[in-house]
Amino acid sequence: MMKKRLWSRWILALAVVWPCMAAAHDRVREKENFDFDWKFILNADDRANAGMQVSEAGWQDVQLPHDWSISQNFDPKLSGSNGHLPGGIGWYRKTFRVDKKDKGRRIAVLFDGIYSRSDVYVNGQHLGFRPYGFCYQEYDLTPYLNYGAENVLAVRVNNPLEHDSVARWYTGAGIYRHAWLVKTAEVHVASYGTYVTTPVVTAERAEVRVRTSVANEAERTKTLSVRQQITDGEGRTVVQSGKQALQVAAGQTADTEHTLEIPRPQLWDTEHPYLYTLHTSVYDGRKLVDTYETVFGVRTCEFTSDRGFLLNGKPLKLKGFCLHQDDASLGTALPLRSMERKLEICKEYGVNAIRCSHNQPSPEFLDLCDRMGFVVIDEAFDKWKSGYYAQYFDAWWQEDLKNMLVRDRNHPCVVLWSIGNELQEAWDGSDTGCRRAAMLQDFVHEFEPSRQVCLAAQNRHNEKFSGVTDVVGYNYLEARMLSDHKKFPERRFLVTEELPYYCGAEGNIRSYDTNNPWNIIAENDFIAGGFLWSGTDYIGEAGWPSHGWPAGLFDICMVEKPRAAFHRAMWNDEPMVRIAVRDNALDIDHGRDLWQWPNMAAIWNFPRAYEGLVIEVNTTTNCERVALFHNGNEMGVRRTADYPNHTITWCLPYRRGTLVAKGINGTDTVAVHEIRTAGDAVRLKATADRGKLMADGQDLSYVQVELLDKDGTLVQHADRRMKASIEGEGRLVGFISSDLRRKTPFTSHEDKTYFGRAMAIVQSTRKAGTIRLRFDVEGWDEPVWVELTSEALPKDYVSDIPSFR
């Protein structure tokens, strides 16, 4: 239901705005989803696979997005950076037809992302190679097509995962983002060919400057005209330009510029992310030959040396998560709902900023951030001349950086470009790193000057290096930032990676100070904000037997951990209190080094031998005081201000029963949290985040299961093996607990609960109907069923996501 509420007005706007243009849109520009009916084979590398006549016996039927690595078995000999999962060489083939009536149009294929080292062919003709797996790729198919007959699109993907070819985190493998067939006239707006800026913004007016790149693939020069129209969030016309003449030579692209004015603009911000739409029309004489839509927001953004980050002239402390792009059993092949769900959970938690670590995200991820009100650091690279990108840097960095800038420059959520992270060049005592950083920053400034540029510097970085970019990002160096601010008061500081619990001292990042780094960020106005490493657990960057990073505030199933209470308290005004119990015997995957946490859980179950032993209990709160009750007996009332990190420490002898914490402001109890001793598990509770899905073959429902005792208390101390299965018009993507030390593949349908929980991911098919999900618990006689429904798309359905139109 939340999805419908979030997007309904945008669907309505598409239906009612500019009807003449909507009708023409069907004739002049078409964007067809190309995700279905692909064939795939792994590790059968033969260049003949690119041809027309290939036996597809032994090839799998797959749909996009597709990540072949996520379903494979773990191997301790493989890199932990990739979650101990294999790569290899995969081939994809898709047979399709193009109608004879499309002859004379330009037909192109657009891939949002292929990881990695991809070669693309149509009808045996090689179209191109792209090594970097995070860029979009567009290829013109027109010269090679058979009209009214079969065509074959083939893609070879090579992800070898050798030492110098593997990223530091799980990237997945394959055509892991969407694909599109785009049909236009020979004269058309180039892909991502509009550039919208708002250089003047006041309460009375916003000046909107538009640069449009128009491509002419006809055989003669064209004299064209271009018109712009802006509509508001309700679909009403705000302003419209006249037609502006433009001459484009054959085989060339030319730009035209318009300046429009929005009276009394509604500004985009994190609380009210208001959006406008630019409609671009291209005419050849009186004939409309192309239309193009660009969603944008009116806002100003600036990082300053004294006030931090300013959004529309007002300071906004960035409460950020660093996020990679994987999601449990899906790997990196993420449908829209996967991203939407994660961002919904982040928003509720208090996050207002996302750092896309360490690559540009999918285009629809930024569409969601635009609409949900997140500010984003869009990051081009992890490393430059070291690591997996080193072999391609010299030949490809300009193309890859431009790819990000062109695609993402109109998103109001993007407030900062990042050109690199934890770079080897930062340690170089020479000026090589400084020159390289300046080279990349100059490229960004020339191509997209409306935003500032940063890089993320690590421990022991060269002082000169961090002074090159507009904004300097520090990873885990809050203490050094305080002294560097005194040395370099003109620098603009941002914590690009923030430890979740411990804090390093200046000159000793591993001092394990228990003053949470967020305290330094919050207390100093000049620091723009911080981005937690990491917001969530993720696959990769692991040591056997773990297959992922377990030190996030949310686990891989997006369940909030007890350790996340501090930032929830700091990032929200709503009163809250949370109980967490310290126990070093808990079976928790700690992670490593300074990213660890003390062993804590919201659990009150210990062996009988613990009776009477003193247990440490923590209550984290944003209230003035906390009263703690043990089995109904008050253990005291304590002031939050008397304890560090808004966390009050209590010590009390263990007795089975209940612990209740009450948060108090003034004389009022404003928040309550209770944990209790659980008995034996006697029933399974299954909760779907959405009971109705769209029958589009992509939509998802996340079904969480919990072991409960007879009183409904979560049983976290006695996990059980379970099996999930499915009937009807759905596909079981996987059944997974949040324990990253698993032995079965991420797409397995069997697992053991972890702290009483596990999760199934269900995907719709393209047929409406009922979906029945079954859970069988080891040792229990009766299964538990969950019923979902999948509804057909309306005949006139138009996607509400700009990247899907």
Model-derived features: positions:
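Active-site-adjacent substrate/metal-binding segments within catalytic domains
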Residues: H66-N123, G128-P131, E138, V182, ...
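Beta-strand-rich binding/interaction modules
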Residues: V122, R205-L246, A254-T256, T280, ...
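Accessory beta-strand-rich segments of carbohydrate-active enzymes
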Residues: F34, L42-N43, N82, G87-Y195, ...
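Short, hydrophobic beta-strand segments
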Residues: L141-P143, E257-L267, I648-Y654, T747-R766
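Short glycine/proline/serine/threonine-rich loop/turn segments at secondary-structure transition edges
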Residues: D102-R105, L145-E150, D164, T221, ...
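Substrate-binding clefts and catalytic carboxylate motifs of secreted carbohydrate-active enzymes
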Residues: E30-A50, Q63-L64, W68-I70, G87, ...
